[in-house]
Amino acid sequence: MSYFDISGATFNEQLKALETSDPCHADVFNALFRQLINNDVALKEAVTNFAGSKNEQALFILNLHKDGKKYGVHFDNYDVTPSSKGTRLFDAVGMTAAPSTNTVRAVNDFDGKGCFAYLEVNGSVDESGEFQVQYIKDIDNEFSRTKYDTWCLYLTQYVYRKFDSNGEDTVISDARHSAEWLPEGCAIRPDGTIRPFVAIAKYMSGDNADGIASSISGVSPKNYSFQSALTKFRTKGTQYCAETSQDSERMTRLMEIAFATRNSQAVMSGCNNWWYQYAATVQETDVERIIISKSNANNLVVGGTVSIGNATALDSNGKPNNDRGYGGLHTKANKVRITKIEAYDDNNTAVYVDNGGQKFSTSPTTVSGVTCDTVISTMPWNTGSCDDVLGSCGSPISNTSGKEPYILFGVEMSSGFWEPKGNTKQIVWLFSTGKEPYICYASVYLL
């Protein structure tokens, strides 16, 4: 059968008729259309000629990747085999995947295949909960990762799960093969109908130039609680919230099936070992760098986000309070990028930062007669730190250092802090020890 979806497109009537009157030749056309994927100029021309609205254009491109195949993985129960490694199933058998870096494009056989294929777009969610594409990467010159909310669009997953005494199978496809194959949660509308594609924000939320929560590259991710995130996102519209449980579930499936493991940190660790604070060992003025000991500098990474400043309060023991929650730790350089790390002398290393040309001093200050050294503090990575990764998955320099975020099929994650689920609450009942989690499928109803 043909997997090319022409619904809503503007083909001439003869080409449309092939889908029902001559499916064999329709498949020939499908194969030709799939060749467009590797020809940017031809793809741009075809999209603008064959599809009308931006949503239709996006679906046109995604459907070029549609293959109807089944990609699966089996994990043994612990009492069968206490291993995090999985066994590939169905069409995933024989496939391989490895994460890339900024300098190495690794082999990932899942790239561009069915549910693993993604399309970067600018867009928004309207008041009815429907995603509206504004610009498409490599199609529209207006597309921007820094000006407009950036998302990754995927074909809707249909999921098959099987549990038995040996373990569990998880299989996904872009086609529903039987009633046992259920649509992913992201794709289910409140009325029960199924969306043809799902949108996942590419970046953690940070403020744009107007102070609006945005999925854009090059900003500092904001620190939110469940409630403060909901309040902030409601300024964008009633259908916005932080990352949902369904978002997380979808990306977890992609990780487990593509890499056939539940030990995700063995593949891409993410930023979970990045909590350093070091005092200046050499004082300078009018600089955009801080000099620290050589051994301490070895723990830092070019591209990482840091703040530089001095304590403005003392702790209960009368010592400088270097808690990152205090503003003084960010006064000289606030969540800026490390641009270079180079030797200063035999014992010390200079760590350069991009502070926008604003120079500072690394001399100590005083609080109530107590000397407060200038310190550099690691912070969650700014968004867009993985923009130069050469593949669909991977970290900038090292995938397993524990100091860097990564992208997983286009979505940047694990930037160095916890991320509460934006549509999930746990209710603790009065006069009871019971707790119940609740997931909301329509953000407009979140309180």
Locations of regions flagged by a protein language model:
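Extracellular "spike/adhesin" assembly and maturation modules
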Residues: 1-48
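Hydrophobic beta-strand signal
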Residues: 16, 307-308, 419-420
